[in-house]
Amino acid sequence: GRGFSAPAGVDEAGRGPLAGPVVAAAVILPPGYFHPGIRDSKKLSHRQRERLYPVITADAVAFGIALATPGEVDALNILRASLLAMRRAVEALLLPADFLFIDGNRRIPCDVPQETVVGGDGRCVSIAAASILAKVSRDRMMVEYDRIYPGYGLSGHKGYPTREHLEAIRRLGPSPIHRRTFRGVVV
């Protein structure tokens, strides 16, 4: 982290789903931190991510997890809602970050100096750690939502547009956590 004492990696999960929030995480790791298992959450199994979650939260100097609601996704658009969730995750850090490494190519709207890293979840350990916290947190929320809104199979597909999910929306109509502005969500 080039001389910064508290750089945070920031990433989000849940841009593509038709239902549920966008969840973001910001993680500050100790200087020189390395863990062979921590890499892009999309390359890890559900079980590997669940196993790494408590390792990351224990080892991190600080972490923040936050979300943008399905209503905010509809009101703002998915990109702006993702950036909002990431800003909230940075604001949730108990130790303020002095620099941000953001996965992707869009800066987040806040005053902390930052650098965007395309493919960052595969190139920067703090972004990879953030991707795991965001994905695990979101997956756990979707399992809870499946209990509240049964019939859509949310705990299986996590809100992504599977055939089963699209058929359930056609059959049941959208739930309160469905993103009304997304194609496939028939109101």
PLM feature segments, named:
Residues 1-187:
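RNase H-like, Mg2+-dependent phosphodiesterase core
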